[in-house]
Every structure is written in C-alpha cells, then in structure tokens.
C-alpha cells in the first residue's frame, strides 16, 4: 500500500526541472521523495522517526524511507515494483547543461530493502544532493501529493513545468533545451504527430484530471516545420490544496501583523532585532507565541 502523508508544497530546483533524463514513474517518485528530503534538510527540520532518515556520508547522503513512499495506492507483492525501480535508477544518470556548466552524474547506489519492515535505504551521490539544494537557477513549486498521483512520467514533468506558471511558455521540440533531448526520447516518436500524441497529449490528459495546473498547447512553425509548442497555462483553483493556499497567503503577511504587539516590540527594542530578521524567523516565533504561555 502507498504511504499516507499530509500534502506539502515542494520547492524543486530548476536544475532538476530542466535536467535530461528518462525515468519510469516509480523512479520519478524516488526522486520526488529525495527532493522532499532535501527540502527538509535545507529547512533544518529534524526527521524524528526511524522510518525516514538522512545520514551524511563522505560522498553524498544515505536515505532511509518506507517502500510505500513510492507507490500509488497499490500493493507491491514481494516488493517487485520497488526492486525494479531502485535497480533501474541505480544504473541511470542525470545530465544538466547551461551556458556555464555541463555535468552528468549517477544518481543512487546500493539500494536495499528490509523485507520484514518494508524500509528501503540507498546512497545518493553528492552532485545529485547538491543539485536538489541549489536554487541559484530558480525553482518550481508544486504539491507533492498531486505529483505522486500521476501514472505517466510525462505528466509529472509537464506538471513541474506548468506549476505556478502564469504566462505562456514556449517549449522547443529539438535542440539542447528541447523536449526530445530533455526527456531522452532521441530516436522515438520521430513524427511530430506521434510525439504530440504520445507525450504532450498523454501529459495534458492527466493534468486535466488531477492537477490544479494544466495547459493548452499551440503548435509553432518555421515555414512548414513544427519547431515546438507554446503552452498556455490553465489553472483549476478548486483543485489546489486549501491548506497550502492558506500557508502561501500567511507567508506573504509580515510578522508585524501576525505577532502580538508586546512580542514584536520586545524583540525589536530589547534585543535590537531588525524587521527583516524577525520576518525571517516569524514561523518559529508565531509557533512559540501560540504554544508557550507568557512567551515574552
């Protein structure tokens, strides 16, 4: 059975959004969980249970998580799906290139499943872990539960592209930034109509069904040759998680409006905190104010 976890907003480095790879849906769910772990690490959130662990190593990190974390409301008899996904992912790599760098790296190694507990452990190579933590190229924000629902890896990748997108987005078919190379589909779906039917239409169908974000694709041509598509964002507001909407709304409100006057003034005038310092730590301060009597 799949693991039931509360929904959360995940911030994915644009390096991962634009990386070139060809993963199965199960392999992609391992990556989603890896990115979730990286976000917790970055936020300094301690994982307190024995089923989820991040342990630094000399050349990366060791991850522990339940096998159920990568399943989609399904049973996995004798861990067949999980074993296949971990084995396949350990033989694959990811490629990234921009105007300054190019790199290719293996992703994970030494996957292990404890059959009695259903706990998986694996090692993540350092460049992969650093890429998950690197937001210097920008990022995409998406809902983890929504991302885990998709059956098609193309739906997953288009969801990452379109999540939060408010303006039309041109995606070329060919070239180093093209969909064919980004999805590692060289030699497949050579006819444009086949590519659209097998990749874009499949992704759109799932996004239209499950996602708050979808798109309408307009074919773009140079002469008679199709060079790509402009994706016009479609937003289904009723599908967005209300709790995450509220979190986003609160995040925009300054600490001055959320902290009690005596708490805010005490921090500012007794400890000489600047307003931006209080804002950076407002989540912790608000929790303390709400939970601890006579907080200050």
Predicted regions and their residues:
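Charged, alpha-helix-forming regions
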Residues: 1-295
């Amino acid at each position: 059975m799949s693991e039931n976890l509360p929904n959360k907003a995940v911030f994915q480095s644009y390096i991962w959004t634009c990386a070139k790879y060809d993963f199965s849906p199960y392999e992609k769910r391992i990556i989603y969980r890896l990115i979730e772990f990286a976000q917790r690490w970055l936020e300094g959130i301690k994982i307190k249970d024995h089923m989820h662990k991040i342990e630094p190593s000399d050349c990366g990190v060791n991850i522990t998580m339940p096998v159920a974390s990568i399943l989609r409301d399904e049973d996995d008899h004798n861990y067949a799906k999980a074993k296949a996904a971990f084995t396949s992912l350990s033989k694959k790599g990811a490629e990234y290139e921009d105007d300054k760098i190019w790199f290719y790296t293996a992703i994970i190694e030494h996957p292990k499943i404890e059959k009695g507990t259903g706990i998986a452990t694996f090692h993540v190579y350092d460049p992969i872990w650093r890429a998950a933590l690197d937001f210097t190229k920008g990022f995409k924000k998406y809902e983890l539960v929504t991302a885990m629902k998709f059956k098609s890896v193309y739906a997953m990748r288009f969801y990452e592209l379109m999540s939060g997108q408010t303006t039309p987005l041109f995606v070329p078919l060919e070239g180093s930034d093209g969909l064919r190379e980004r999805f590692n589909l060289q030699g497949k779906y050579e006819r444009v109509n086949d590519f659209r039917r097998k990749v874009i239409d499949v992704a759109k169908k799932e996004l239209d069904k499950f996602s708050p974000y979808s798109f309408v694709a307009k074919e773009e041509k140079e002469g008679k040759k199709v060079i790509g598509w402009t994706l016009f964002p479609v937003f289904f507001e009723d599908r967005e998680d209300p709790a995450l909407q509220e979190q986003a709304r609160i995040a925009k409100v300054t600490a001055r409006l959320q902290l009690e006057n005596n708490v805010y003034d005490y921090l500012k005038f007794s400890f000489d905190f600047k307003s931006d310092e209080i804002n950076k730590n407002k989540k912790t301060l608000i929790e303390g104010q709400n939970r601890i009597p006579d907080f200050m």
